[in-house]
Amino acid sequence: TQGNTCGGETCSAAQVCLKGKCVCNEVHCRIRCKYGLKKDENGCEYPCSCAKASQ
């Protein structure tokens, strides 16, 4: 979930805590998105969430 503290930083909802560091979540789903998957400020993809045209 968003806001998890991990080794002194806060992970986004698209990240998981691994060995004290926020890393991109490796969960993927089989959906097609016109504009690709939604990404956080670190470039990590949110699982099964489509991006909007403006991203």
Swiss-Prot record:
Which Gene3D superfamilies does the annotation name?
Antistasin, domain 1
Cellular compartments annotated = Secreted
Instruction: Indicate yes or no for the key word Amino-acid biosynthesis.
Output: no
Task: Show which residues form the site (Reactive bond).
Answer: R30, I31
- What Gene Ontology molecular-function terms does this entry list? heparin binding; serine-type endopeptidase inhibitor activity
Q: Name one GO biological process term.
A: negative regulation of coagulation
Major localization class:
secreted
Which Cys pairs are S-S linked?
A: C6-C17, C11-C22, C24-C44, C29-C48, C33-C50
A Gene Ontology cellular component where this protein is annotated is: extracellular region
What region holds the Antistasin-like domain?
A: 24-50
Q: Extract the InterPro entries matched here.
A: Antistasin-like (IPR004094), Hirudin/antistatin (IPR011061), Prot_inh_I15_antistasin_leech (IPR008086)
What keywords tag this UniProt record? Disulfide bond, Heparin-binding, Protease inhibitor, Secreted, Serine protease inhibitor
Q: Does the keyword DNA damage apply?
A: no
Write out the similarity annotation: Belongs to the protease inhibitor I15 (antistasin) family.
Write out the function statement from the record: Acts as an inhibitor of tissue kallikrein, trypsin, chymotrypsin and neutrophil cathepsin G.
Question: How is this protein named in the record?
Answer: Hirustasin
Q: Which organism is it from?
A: Hirudo medicinalis
